[in-house]
């Protein structure tokens, strides 16, 4: 079975208070929702943590395929392209500086160094009307009214 997740991260101030959200919909039912908040973080860190959250779910569930949609080009490029070079170069970037979010990158690398056959990551455009992405965005950014409006407009069954 395919499980589809939408992830998003948000931050006010960058760095500042922020959070990330993960949602999964099946037809018109919200079947999974997770939100975590932090007092001092960055938007990129939140985007990475949201994707890492689903990686952990996929690693523990070999019976299902996980498709993750994210609107973060930074997170997707970091995880699918740059991370391998960073690992080879001692977690230094092309400017010979330590990569940002090294702790998360090293944890993510433990999942991607041997590709997970049941995990796929795809880029979507943010704020483009894609329901799952909009729900994740509203939860990550603490926009409760937007979330409730989306639930009502699309007749989503919220658990």
Question: What are the residue ranges of the model-derived segments?
Answer:
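RNase H-like nuclease fold core
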Residues: 1-46, 56-61, 79, 138, ...
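RNase H catalytic domain
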Residues: 10-14, 53-135, 139, 144
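Short, conserved alpha-helix that lines the donor NDP-sugar binding/gating region
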Residues: 47, 51
């Amino acid at each position: 079975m395919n499980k589809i997740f939408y992830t998003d991260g948000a931050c006010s101030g960058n760095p500042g208070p922020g959070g990330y959200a993960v949602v999964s919909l099946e037809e018109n039912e919200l079947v999974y929702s997770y939100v975590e908040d932090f007092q001092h973080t960055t938007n990129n860190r939140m985007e990475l943590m949201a994707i890492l959250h689903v990686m952990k779910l996929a690693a523990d569930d070999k019976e299902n395929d996980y498709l993750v949609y994210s609107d973060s080009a930074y997170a997707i490029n970091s995880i699918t392209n740059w991370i391998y070079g960073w690992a080879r170069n001692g977690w230094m970037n092309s400017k010979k500086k330590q990569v940002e979010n090294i702790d998360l990158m090293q944890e993510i690398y433990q999942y991607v160094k041997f590709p997970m056959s049941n995990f796929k990551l795809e880029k979507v455009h943010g704020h483009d009307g894609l329901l799952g992405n909009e729900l994740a965005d509203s939860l990550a950014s603490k926009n409760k009214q937007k979330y409730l409006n989306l639930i009502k407009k699309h007749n989503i069954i919220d658990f």
